[in-house]
Amino acid sequence: TLAEFSLDALIKDLLPASQFMTNVKMKEDTSENVEFAIRLQGDVLVPVDSHFPVEKFKAITDGYDADDKRAVADARAKLATAFKAKAKSVNEKYIVPPKTTDFAIVYAPTESLYKELTEYQDPSTKELLTQELMKKHKVVICGPNTLSAYLQSLHMGFQSLKVQKGATEI
């Protein structure tokens, strides 16, 4: 899918092969594999999965094009529901401390999709979708720019550790 292809390209462009794994089985009692796992110090893994429900996102853009506020609101609610289900699934399948971090990342492959997700507020609770997903399911949504920044900061941290280790050995 577009999401998987985009995530693959981003991770492979920003991290050396030693810092990530692909199609990783997180739990022994399942056949489910997370698309990527970023290796942290101590071989702790950050699960990274992608999600792009194209039809639900297209319904939002169609609503905007038709200047139909009700259609946009309905489509945004359906998109939020799809990401809530994805976050729940990712939590259940891939977050398994101490093998992994106590959170996972779900990658939204376009900035426009990421914008919709970060701006969506539950009409009844007024809670932002991104906050709800983190609180309930320990899932962080990242778009291309935020994931790039996260991966670059991890890579710089790993480089600093290498330099520090080298200096200690001298």
Task: List the predicted regions and their residue ranges.
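Amphipathic, heptad-repeat alpha-helical coiled-coil/stalk segments that mediate oligomerization
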Residues: 1-170
